[in-house]
Amino acid sequence: MEYNFREIEKKWQQRWAENHTYQVTEDESKKKFYVLNMFPYPSGAGLHVGHPLGYIASDIYARYKRLQGFNVLNPMGYDAYGLPAEQYAIQTGQHPAITTVNNINRYREQLDKIGFSFDWNREVRTCEPGYYHWTQWAFQQMFNSYYCNDTQQARPISELTEAFARYGNEGLNAACSEELSFTAEEWNAKSEKEQQEILMNYRIAYLGETMVNWCPQLGTVLANDEVVDGVSERGGFPVVQKKMRQWCLRVSAYAQRLLDGLDTVDWTDSLKETQRNWIGRSEGTEVQFKVKDSDIEFTIFTTRADTMFGVTFMVLAPESELVPQLTTEAQKAEVEAYLDRTKKRTERERIADRRVTGVFSGSYAINPFTGEAVPVWISDYVLAGYGTGAIMAVPAHDSRDYAFAKHFNLPIVPLVEGCDVSEESFDAKEGIVCNSPRKDVTPYCDLSLNGLTIKEAIAATKEYVKAHNLGRVKVNYRLRDAIFSRQRYWGEPFPVYYKNGMPYMIDSSKLPLELPEVAKFLPTETGEPPLGHATKWAWDVEKGEVVENNLIDNVTIFPLELNTMPGFAGSSAYYLRYMDPHNAQALVSEKADHYWQNVDLYVGGTEHATGHLIYSRFWNKFLHDLGVSIKEEPFQKLVNQGMIQGRSNFVYRIKDTNTFVSLNLKDQYETTPLHVDVNIVSNDILDVEAFKAWRPEYNDAEFILEDGKYICGWAVEKMSKSMYNVVNPDMIVEKYGADTLRMYEMFLGPVEQSKPWDTNGIDGVHRFLKKLWNLFYSRTDEFLPVEGEPTKEELKAIHKLIKKVTGDIETFSYNTSISAFMICVNELTSLKCRNKEVLSNLIILLAPFAPHYAEELWEALGNTTSVCDAQWPAFNEDYLKEDTVKYTISFNGKARFTMDFAADADNNTIQTTVMADEQAQKWIEGKTPKKVIIVPKKIVNIVL
């Protein structure tokens, strides 16, 4: 009986679906284990072989935990909102919902063929109203909350309104956009609109003026990671910096908790460090500077308070509100020209680019420690969102300030004894302070730092600043609030209407607010987002429903928000929704949340380190504050799978001809390498006829072969349609089967490493499965396994495998597991193993890797339940102990022969036995050995 993978895989996929094999419910009698993949965006291209890598890795682990007796949740869904479907709608007129559903159906078909243990009963799609109901609900909760710094948690905004009415904001310690000061009397005298504007300063979801990446052609704001080299990642359209009123989430309020939480999760050190750097905590000092000949003052933040005496100029971010205030008439044209240039660069590009650019504002600031007037410059190396958007420049001790000072010929004053700043800045925080103040200058203040260490000088300056009302000590974070608006159609609508220009939430009992139909998916002619085309997009407060726009009276019927939510909105709490996806009353029930708690294993790419993995942690912490999520951290263990790169093939066309020369002959001609479809190449040998049929221009191609074959060149590149190196998993499944695909993807290398796809090795994995099959079936279709006692050798082989595979799965070293399977099968084949107990354990071990194959043989062994419900075998160390040990017998360090000894033989027995052996006597030749050296369990060396 041959291994017929097509019949087997079809049979078991159907059986799993009919029996709901992977459907799971809360079971208090079992320990839970929650496995989750970062769910895919369903693109039109479908899956290539790189996409399932992480899914296969997590599926192996999920199956393994189920075999260990855990109740395993392993769901799948779709991150269904996104730009590609909307762009396709703009080009074709086809509604994004249709495109998305078609793409999802294609993805589902491909995923099913690979044999994943997903509980499809829990599938979520972020574009469905039943799902985004809870995205809208969470947004409303954020709008109706503020962040209390004293208790370090979100609290109801109603607490603030009550406190303001009684005490004003005296003593309030809350996260805010700007620091305000007002009394209860002043608050109570304000209009409703004025009060709402003040509350907006504290809400966790708020409207704020922010600098954004604006793409005119796409008509929307883009996140930093959607912009590359000043153009949009999608379409390559120009992107500029623009100030807009946008919905924002006060992620910055959670900065310290986001940092602290990293100490409680099992993530890689590199990913944790990436997040720590992104959050960017720094302890420092805020200092007030006065503008010369003006009443204007501004604040800077510095972590190097010891360097105040070395400030030789100030720098403002181009977006700073101080720029128009401090720009003199004489400098106005030059400044405006500079601002136009900087608008074309994203913050990320500005951080990465070390080129020096800037312009003088025309104004000067007074250094409060020296009394000197220092010039105020404008430069894009200063960012508006970090600190105060203004810096004091100390070129002697900061590399970017140093480069700026050198470029514009500004003074450089060293502040550390013995430091040389003739070629570069001295950035080390070590040494003895000098020139603070300079000896040749009359002191302006009564502070002297000379002779102190840098650490002592920082502390002394902080005390001086506080004592003389020059500023305050402060902790800053680089982490910004998240911009939460997009000027697109295909996204979650905001459950918001506008009254007197201020936002109000629709009643939560009326959620979800569904996305309306529009005639066009582009912005309106007046520049409004695509929802501006909707004719039925107004909110009737009394009826609690959406009505026609022409009914708007701004009394009971109001306009609805025209922006939609960004891509990360739907993915920020999907792990919670999987716990209870059909609950119409809550995001997740208390029972489900308390049972599943959080994700035990999360698998996805490192590209989400500073996006999704920050936002989802913030979102979960907020829901934890509300008592919705029992765990503060959503993902306990995170594994980042590497990328499967493409292995491109090349043909070599002789210049000015349609003749192609084989790889090893190409140096004899002047050739041009051309990418060729890898699907018509096998083991680097081109299917010449398929190539001629591939493209019309190659129909009459001629070939110069070697040994009757056309050998292609190859290179490892990104898997891309333009390089013709995309491999469709459907083709691999059709040719070799899903179990071969699963095992081969794991065999390519460690899960976390990137590696090239190379079909040249897939035959070996397929042959392994055939060889294993032969342990169960003879060539005459006889079923071979029988009952009986296993031999010592069989027990040793299988328990060695149990130990190896168990350890490898725990560490995601799947590639070495598969090597171990191959070794074990070779050993069992040599032993002519027919033992049912041994072979049953072998199949259980294989089940996570090759589930269809394992199910078929498990059933053949007489089992009536799924192999998924078998018990993972425990290894017995006793079976791995060696009864005998092979010693190498050496004479004067040269190995001559080997001898076997009992594992517990003592040195005296070993020496006596060796010396009496005929082979030893031959090499001793009657001499008396000087000494005998025995290395336990390895070598006996006789020194003559």
Swiss-Prot record:
Principal cellular location given in the protein's record: cytoplasm
GO cellular-component terms in the record?
A: cytosol
The catalytic activity, as recorded, is: tRNA(Leu) + L-leucine + ATP = L-leucyl-tRNA(Leu) + AMP + diphosphate
Please give the Gene Ontology molecular function terms for this protein.
Answer: aminoacyl-tRNA deacylase activity; ATP binding; leucine-tRNA ligase activity
Residues annotated for ATP binding in this entry = K721
Question: Which organism is this protein's natural source?
Answer: Phocaeicola vulgatus (strain ATCC 8482 / DSM 1447 / JCM 5826 / CCUG 4940 / NBRC 14291 / NCTC 11154)
Give the matching InterPro entries. aa-tRNA-synth_I_CS, aa-tRNA-synth_Ia, Leu-tRNA-ligase, Leu_tRNA-synth_edit, M/V/L/I-tRNA-synth_anticd-bd, Rossmann-like_a/b/a_fold, tRNAsynth_Ia_anticodon-bd, Val/Leu/Ile-tRNA-synth_edit
Q: Which processes are annotated in GO (biological process)? A: leucyl-tRNA aminoacylation
E.C. number, please? Answer: 6.1.1.4
The record, for Gene3D superfamilies, names: HUPs (3.40.50.620), Isoleucyl-tRNA Synthetase, Domain 1 (1.10.730.10)
| Motif 'HIGH' region: where in chain | 40-51
UniProt KW keywords: Aminoacyl-tRNA synthetase, ATP-binding, Cytoplasm, Ligase, Nucleotide-binding, Protein biosynthesis
**Which Pfam families does the UniProt record give?**
Anticodon_1, tRNA-synt_1, tRNA-synt_1_2
Motif 'KMSKS' region located where? 718-722
Which NCBIfam families does the UniProt entry name for this protein? leuS_bact
Family in the record: Belongs to the class-I aminoacyl-tRNA synthetase family.
Q: Where in the cell is it found?
A: Cytoplasm
Q: What is this protein called?
A: Leucine--tRNA ligase
